[in-house]
Amino acid sequence: MAKGAVKKEKFEYEFFGPIGALGVTVLTTVVSFGSFYICNEEGCPAKFSKISHIFKKTPLFDQKSLILYLLWFSTLTLLWKCTNGKWAKGTPIDDKGTRLLYKINGFNSACLILGVVCTSIYLLGASCMEFIWDNFLQLMFAAYVFSVVLCTFCYVQSFFGKQQLAKGGTSGNILFDWFIGRSLNPRIGNFDIKCFCELRPGLILWVVFDIAFACHQYLVLGGRITDSMVLVIIFHTWYVLDSLINESAVLTTMDITTDGFGYMLSFGDLVWVPFLYSLQARYLAFHPVDLGLVKTLAILCLQFLGYYIFRGANGQKNRFRSNPNDPKLKHLKFIQTKRGTKLLTSGWWGMARHINYFGDWIMAWAWCLPAGFGSPIPYFYVAYFGVLLVHRNARDDHKCRVKYGEDWEKYCKAVKYRIIPYVY
């Protein structure tokens, strides 16, 4: 009892504890479904009378949509099992240095799925993708229900057998632990649920949605797609495929190494990413924008700049963490912590503690600008993402301050800026 009391006393809540967890759960649900009601063919933003009409006439549940989503998740699981891929070791998850194995074959799955989608469009025509347009809300509801069931399953599973628990999900409060995630690595055999959801069902579905919306625009415009839609699809597909090509890099991120798999990640991976991140493509499907050559080239340059920073920084960090003794990295300066970890203070990571976030945010602007300035709603992503990155930086900073102590203070003096060099 005494030991239990000490643990409870030392526990520090994130997101303002259970009340914050409930608030985020409700808010993200409202925003996700609200994005459909408020931004559609009736207007973006639509008038209240139109929103009310859509709300009344459009059912949330559709059996075909639920079956299709379950088939989608099952197909990707089967592809994970059946397609070739190397096995990579994750970072140590305990003091004994235990490292879990992860199958890296997400890129193969994406290529197969997108190949089937494109072949179907070529053979059957753009109209074969209209089910997604006509049942987008119902598909969102199916994904939402599935994400809640999945994170609840992982929460219950965490109480049975030998489980590595996430430190942040052991408060003892059911709501908070369910939200933040109690199990660090929920698995069925060697199938890691968290790592699988991180990069596959949501990310690949995001691209499928973009393609479906481009098909709808093609049908509406009588056989053409705007340059703005082409840009959005290229940027999103590029981001997704690049993430899957570099799938092993996710094994060193906070989502995998630190966070449990609760509602926050389950909902984020399966609902928020595909249904909210495809907002620009959905908007352009009913509000086409023709950019012209100059604007197209300017947005392309912005995307390339963001990607150069994002991928360069992440690649450098991943190589250094995987093999800090690599001769190619000997020019990099670092602080040796008392815990044995090395903190980079030069290269990309000498510019800002999260320079990769800056690159990510620049790309977010490139994804939103093709929508033009007819509505502020397509820019929701860049605003939300900026807030997310600032919050994630603060969260990471707090954890590192606790973890490294005075070494972190020394590191912050060496690398003064958080995200944007010379600004923030």
From Swiss-Prot:
Biological function: Delta(14)-sterol reductase; part of the third module of ergosterol biosynthesis pathway that includes by the late steps of the pathway. Erg24 reduces the C14=C15 double bond of 4,4-dimethyl-cholesta-8,14,24-trienol to produce 4,4-dimethyl-cholesta-8,24-dienol. The third module or late pathway involves the ergosterol synthesis itself through consecutive reactions that mainly occur in the endoplasmic reticulum (ER) membrane. Firstly, the squalene synthase erg9 catalyzes the condensation of 2 farnesyl pyrophosphate moieties to form squalene, which is the precursor of all steroids.
Subcellular localization, as worded in the UniProt entry: Endoplasmic reticulum membrane
Membrane topology according to the record: Multi-pass membrane protein
Similarity remark: Belongs to the ERG4/ERG24 family.
Protein name, UniProt field: Delta(14)-sterol reductase erg24
GO CC annotations, alphabetized: endoplasmic reticulum; endoplasmic reticulum membrane
InterPro entries linked: ERG24_DHCR-like (IPR001171), Sterol_reductase_CS (IPR018083)
Natural source organism: Schizosaccharomyces pombe (strain 972 / ATCC 24843)
